[in-house]
Regions:
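Alpha/beta-hydrolase fold catalytic core
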Residues: 1-54, 79-80, 120, 303-306
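Conserved alpha/beta-hydrolase catalytic His-Asp/Glu region
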Residues: 15-16, 22-23, 161-165, 181-242
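Active-site loop/oxyanion-hole signature of alpha/beta-hydrolase fold enzymes
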Residues: 38-39, 46-48, 87-125
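Conserved HGGG/HGGXW glycine-rich cap/lid loop of the alpha/beta-hydrolase fold
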Residues: 48-92
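Flexible "cap/lid" loop of the alpha/beta hydrolase fold
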Residues: 139, 148-178
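Short beta-strand/loop motif that positions the catalytic acidic residue
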Residues: 244, 250-252
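Acidic catalytic loop of the alpha/beta-hydrolase fold
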Residues: 255-259
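Catalytic active-site module of serine/aspartate enzymes centered on a nucleophile-bearing elbow/loop
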Residues: 274-306
Length: 306
């Protein structure tokens, strides 16, 4: 039955790649930058704000892109120099099709990016997968980071049953499902996934869904996305997190079904001195659901530091 359903989905929904040139023509703007890193990586990032301002680097989550932070950039652009980048397999970043999404590799990717740009010490915020990469980078290269903001960050494994997850997550748990997802125009699955991610469904607009779907159809992206190893993202442990030196703010929504609020509380409890904010009636993406409030809390935290 599963095989028949997946075969039908592939036949009905398969969609071709969208060339990078077309995506860049549509989405690039005055803030668009690119830098090349070893391993065939052509990294897209956006840089906004005056160079004299404190530096804030933003990391998106799995399947997302730099655009997830649009609301924060609007709110914080006059207070911070902001750099937001696309991970391999995401957004406008080009990567070899055999790139494997692992937490440790992504942390080293961000470190290499920071070294290439010769960035000074910076504050780092990460959403979901990007949150896991953020705390892993802070452990591996503590001298780079002066503050951490973990937004519904992966860290400790959930205890929830897979049945509670949206269909896209359930399909991706099976090898055959991942093969199907590599080849389809997954717009309807993305709509399902994003609406499950948030409490306020109205924030998931057709334009947002279209953007996710178009970026994921960049050459090689769907293959890279299906390579993700969640065990390298949900691998936090209290003894290891004790070594985190950076002041840390943990943000979560009480209606998050992707990273359970209990996991966020556990993460905050394990990090020395971490502050925790739990938003009522908010899901997995507070930077999209409540951009003004979450950005204000982020700014207050960063500005409270000496």
């Amino acid at each position: 039955m599963l095989l028949a359903a997946l075969t039908l989905a592939w036949l009905e929904l398969r969609g071709p790649d969208i060339p990078y040139e077309m995506l860049e023509a549509k989405f690039a703007d005055d803030a668009t930058r690119f830098v090349d890193l070893p391993g065939g990586l052509h990294v897209h990032y956006q840089e906004e704000g005056h160079a004299s301002l404190p530096l804030l680097v933003l990391l998106h989550g799995y399947g997302d892109s730099y655009t997830t932070w649009d609301g924060w950039v609007r709110e914080l652009g006059r207070q911070f120099r902001i750099i937001r980048l696309d991970f391999p397999g995401h957004g406008l970043t080009r990567a070899p099709c055999d790139y494997v999404l692992r937490g440790d590799a992504l942390a080293e990717f961000v470190d290499a990016f920071a070294a290439k740009l010769d960035l000074p010490q910076f504050s780092l915020a990460g959403s979901s997968m990007g949150g896991s990469v953020a705390w892993q980078l802070a452990l591996r290269h503590p001298d780079r980071i002066n503050a951490l903001i973990l937004v519904d960050a992966a860290g400790f494994p959930n205890e929830q049953s897979p049945v509670r997850l949206p269909i896209a997550y359930q399909i991706a748990r099976f090898r055959l499902g991942r093969v199907v997802l590599r080849n389809i125009d997954n717009q309807s699955l993305i709509d399902d996934l994003l609406k499950a991610d948030v409490y306020d469904k109205s924030v998931i607009t057709p334009a947002l869904v279209d953007r996710w779907a178009e970026f994921q159809r960049a050459p090689g992206h769907r293959t890279i996305l299906m390579s993700a190893d969640p065990t390298t993202l949900n691998n936090a442990s209290a003894p290891v997190l004790l070594y985190l030196q950076a002041p840390t703010l943990v943000i979560t929504g009480d209606s998050d079904v992707v990273v359970e609020p209990a996991s966020a509380r556990k993460l905050a409890a394990a990090i020395p001195g971490a502050k925790l904010i739990v938003y009522p009636h908010v899901g997995h993406l507070p930077q999209i659901e409540i951009p003004q409030r979450s950005a204000a809390d982020a700014a207050a935290f960063l500005q409270s530091r000496p």
